[in-house]
A protein has these predicted regions:
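Formylglycine-dependent sulfatase
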Residues: 1-411, 416-417, 426-463
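Residues forming the ATP-binding cleft of Hanks-type serine/threonine protein kinase domains
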Residues: 423
Length: 463
């Protein structure tokens, strides 16, 4: 009913456009986030004119659940809502209105290119135009046909197929232009749309979802060539006292040519491939920003760029996402708003904050009793401000609360707990939840977790 009532409130021409850019599996591995060994000149340039959130976190360390959470502004709720990659917001929370539908009902023209919702059919009717992908079937069809839809381009890749999944190699370096791979097509479509939407006469919400640096690590050769060597993680071992619920992701094993995390040559190739893909996305992002400037639209367009969750690159002996370690949950988030501040924010923020922030910046009311996040507008006006003390993450029955010092998690079924003190152990190498000195912290954060969950699950949104 809220969306129907909102139809009467058309957005006026003073409302700013929104360019909403997501990159799959992108952790804060950029120069602007202090990583010296990676080449991200375009992200770094953008960061200088934006607010960079240094303590931004996803709410679920897997694409399907994270994206459903971002686009509805709602926390995951195990075991009924946003629990894994298979989830759909339209099924798990059928009464919730996605940001696309909310903006459409308020007079925005909304467009989805590439990977925005994990499943292209999820809330497809909430957009002004049908969501677009170069290959609508997604990454689950025609795996063995390596040249079917620009996933693998080297003929050699077609000789290496995982017989269990029919997927090709976990990485590829093809001597091709940026436009050859799938993300090149996503950029091309977005550039055309940007020009088209400029002349439409109404504000727009243009979502651009890059597939990389998600597996497989396939990027043009010139980006691989940037990394003749990459530094390896120093803590390639399981943290002491880590609960058994925290395990390595098996995602990469669905591809061909895979080894184990203790194989240093394999691990080096994993990190090199990830870095190459990040630099590839950086180059595409730079082209998009250049076109925004060329079209004269930068002064009336909000730009939001972020990753949907983190990724382990050998830390803790893990390769992939799917954990409650900070390497899996911390994400890059940068927001540029014409006329507002630029700088670095140390405030704890989470991806559910994006929805209310967009509503606030666009001058429209938010859906009643739906959103779990807070608007980041106070920080966008003054980066020294803070809007919250902690963030909430959930994964496979594990509840996670992080603040500026601690990473705490608990599993209700087993009673196991996890606590890392970032003042003493920034890399999370020792679980101290069983240390008597930290008992007050465990009790405090456990109580705070219950408060967060009580607020977040105040209303039943599932069928």
């Amino acid at each position: 009913m809220q969306a129907a009532e909102a139809n009467a409130k058309a957005a006026n021409k003073k409302h700013m456009n929104v360019l909403f850019i997501m990159a799959d599996d992108l952790r804060p591995e950029m120069g602007c986030y202090g990583v010296k060994d990676i080449h991200t000149p375009n992200f770094d340039r953008f960061a200088k004119g934006a607010v960079l959130f240094d303590n931004a976190f996803c709410n679920a360390p897997v694409s399907g659940a994270s994206r459903a959470s971002v686009l509805t502004g709602m926390y995951p709720n195990y075991p009924t809502r946003f629990i894994d990659y298979t989830c759909k917001a339209s099924v798990d929370a059928p009464d919730a209105i996605p940001i696309s539908g909310w903006l459409t009902s308020h007079g925005y023209h909304t467009v989805s290119n590439g990977k925005i919702m994990h499943h292209i059919e999820d809330h497809a009717d909430s957009w002004s135009e049908a969501p677009w992908r170069w290959h609508p079937d997604g990454y689950d069809v025609y795996w063995a046909e390596y040249n079917r839809w620009e996933l693998w381009l080297n003929s050699e890749s077609g000789k290496h197929i995982n017989p269990r999944t029919m997927r090709g190699p976990f990485c590829e370096s093809a001597d091709v232009p940026d436009s050859a791979y799938d993300d090149g097509h996503v950029l091309a479509k977005t550039l055309v749309d940007l020009c088209r939407l400029r002349d439409m006469g109404k504000p727009f919400f243009l979502a651009c979802g890059f597939w990389k640096p998600h597996l497989p690590f396939c990027a043009p050769k010139k980006y691989w060539d940037m990394y003749p060597s990459v530094p390896m993680a120093a803590n390639q071992y399981r943290p002491t006292g880590l609960p058994p619920e925290v395990q390595n992701s098996g995602e990469i094993n669905a591809y061909a040519c895979v080894s184990t995390p203790d194989d240093q040559e394999f691990l080096r190739l994993v990190k090199t491939g990830y870095y190459a893909c990040v630099s590839y996305v950086d180059a595409l992002f730079g082209q998009l920003m250049d076109e925004l400037d060329r079209l004269g639209m930068a002064d009336n367009t909000i730009v939001i760029v972020f990753g949907d969750h983190g990724w382990n690159l050998g830390e803790h002996g893990f390769v992939g996402k799917h954990t409650l370690m900070t390497t899996s949950t911390r994400v890059p988030l940068m927001i540029r708003v014409p006329g507002m501040a630029k700088g670095v924010s140390k405030s704890m923020v989470e991806l559910v904050d994006i929805y209310p922030t967009i509503c606030d910046l666009c001058g429209i009311d938010a859906p009643v009793q739906q959103l779990d996040g807070k608007s980041l507008t106070p920080i966008l006006r003054n980066p020294s401000r803070s809007v919250k003390r902690e963030v909430y993450v959930q994964w496979q029955g594990g509840d996670n609360l992080q603040d500026n010092r601690f990473n705490y998690a608990e599993w209700q079924k087993s009673g196991n707990t996890m606590l890392f003190d970032h003042n003493a152990d920034r890399d999370e190498n020792a679980n101290v939840s069983g240390n008597a000195d930290y008992a007050p912290t465990v009790n405090r954060m456990s109580k705070e977790m219950k408060k967060v969950k009580k607020f977040a699950f105040r209303k039943k949104w599932t069928k």
